[in-house]
């Protein structure tokens, strides 16, 4: 028996910015899985549902949990902030599924529900529409070596792109943004 897995973008944090489809699939789901902060963003939509809350850095565990629940026949919403296809859980889910030999025709329905991303939201807030061409670069070197990040920022600057920067710093990374600005 196979269920459904929705990878749901809930937007930048307020229901006014969540899509109707995101609300709909969350309400239809038996089970909600997500990083605790993101689950709390939709707490008014999850009454009576099984909820699995995870800490930051437990992305792989989250991915396996929601896939396993969906394979058991449950309808699962994996909630992510912003858009789960932009530095979100979507890529990891599809990697885990591919490693397990998942076939989209196998019966396990997986659907990506886009959300309003931070880049859209921030551009609107500061009154700077992302027009013509732009590049998006993450300063996080957890999955990408710093040398590659610098190379990408330099290429975007060389191409005269507006550059949207994600993950400018963290507790362990406080100088990456300043170092990357040297290359622009």
Segments (PLM) and residue ranges:
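Active-site rim beta-loop-alpha module in soluble metabolic enzymes
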Residues: 159-174
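Short gly/pro/ser/thr-enriched loop/turn and capping motifs at secondary-structure boundaries
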Residues: 39-41, 59-60, 86, 117-120, ...
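Class I SAM-dependent methyltransferase SAM-binding "motif I" and its flanking Rossmann-like core
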Residues: 14, 20, 88-159
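Short beta-strand segments
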Residues: 8-9, 78-81, 113, 137-140, ...
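Conserved small/polar residues in nucleotide/adenosyl-binding loops
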Residues: 182-184
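Class I S-adenosyl-L-methionine
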Residues: 1-110
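Charged helix-capping and loop-helix junction motifs
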Residues: 150-151, 176-180
């Amino acid at each position: 028996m196979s269920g459904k897995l929705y990878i749901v973008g809930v937007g930048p944090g307020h229901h006014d910015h969540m899509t109707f489809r995101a609300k709909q699939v969350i309400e239809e789901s038996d089970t909600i899985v997500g990083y605790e902060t993101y689950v709390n963003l939709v707490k008014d939509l999850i009454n009576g549902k099984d909820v699995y809350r995870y800490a930051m850095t437990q992305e792989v565990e989250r991915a396996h949990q929601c896939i396993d629940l969906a394979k058991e026949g449950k309808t699962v919403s994996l909630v992510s902030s912003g858009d789960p296809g932009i530095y979100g859980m979507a890529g990891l889910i599809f990697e885990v599924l591919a490693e397990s030999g998942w076939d989209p025709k196998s019966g396990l329905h997986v659907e990506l529900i886009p959300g309003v991303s931070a880049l859209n939201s921030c551009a609107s807030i500061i009154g700077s529409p992302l027009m013509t061409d732009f590049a998006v670069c993450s300063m996080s070197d957890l999955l990408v070596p710093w040398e590659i990040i610098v190379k990408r920022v330099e290429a975007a600057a060389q191409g005269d792109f507006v550059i949207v920067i994600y993950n400018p710093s963290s507790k362990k990374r406080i100088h990456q943004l300043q170092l990357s600005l040297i290359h622009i």
